[in-house]
Amino acid sequence: EEVQQAQEQKHGFTTPNWCYSLYENALRARAGRSYKDHLLHIGKIYERYSENAAKAPEVSWFPNKMSAEEIAVPNFTPGNRAITNVYTRQCCAFNEVDMAAAALVTSVGMAKKLGIPEDKWVYVHGTASTEDTSLMSSRAAYHQSIQHHVGFKKVLEMARKTVDDISFFDIYSPYPCMPQLAAEALNLPVDDRRGWNLVGGHSFHGAPGAGFGCLMVVAMAQKCRENRGQFGLVNTNGGRITTQGYGIYSTEPFPQSVWQAPIPGSYAYEVNTVKRPIFNPVPSGNCVIEVFTVCFGHEFA
């Protein structure tokens, strides 16, 4: 494993912009799209993200609504250069910003004791978490996320809901491949009318690294308060699509007698036992390229 890690570091497999681009290229190839068509495809996905960021200019890093071309076509907008062959600067995460959020998680009894008004209460109906290998070259596939297939299934099972019962989604989206991977796992169109975010994602709202997960939970709590009795699903992400968290929320109380979060270790095998490629430190012979990306510096973009 140390040799494999060293090889990945040598070839840039630890750089998020490059790693997420591998998934994006795989999704493009899977769909059979040309590069031009795929750039417009991801631009249209992120149009809705920019719309949500524009609705909250007081907290968004880029609060201006942008078109698909402005977002995803290199240099359509001055300064929006190509980072890789599928991502422009505006498609990438902006995760070094000064932001914070806080959520108070407690029991009904303690909430009453603290005098928190009941119209502020939001209940957790389901939780789940999954983890994949951190080794990019050992991922089972790049056009889908086995973690999502397991995680979404488990969180919906705990909440006793189906995907049709969910009114709002907020999918952790540092790059456009993330809502597409979620759509694939949930068997939904990527342009689902409910959308995949509430506040604009990493690229438009901006986020303090993985701390964006807390911002998402706070935004979902507010959304649930405004739409009482409806359900929202939040997905968080860490590393390079390495760790995933899932939560379902609503102002509707969950029967306390049956609330029991499954232990992640009880279903980890569903991710861990999937067939994976075997690393060969001394390769020889013919090969098939599974996925690739092209990375640009300032002078070539």
PLM regions with names:
Residues 209-231:
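Phosphate/diphosphate-binding loops
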Residues 1-103, 107-110, 116-207, 222, ...:
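Conserved "HGTGT" condensation-loop signature of ketosynthase/thiolase-family condensing enzymes
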Residues 167-168, 231-233:
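Conserved beta-strand elements of the Class I
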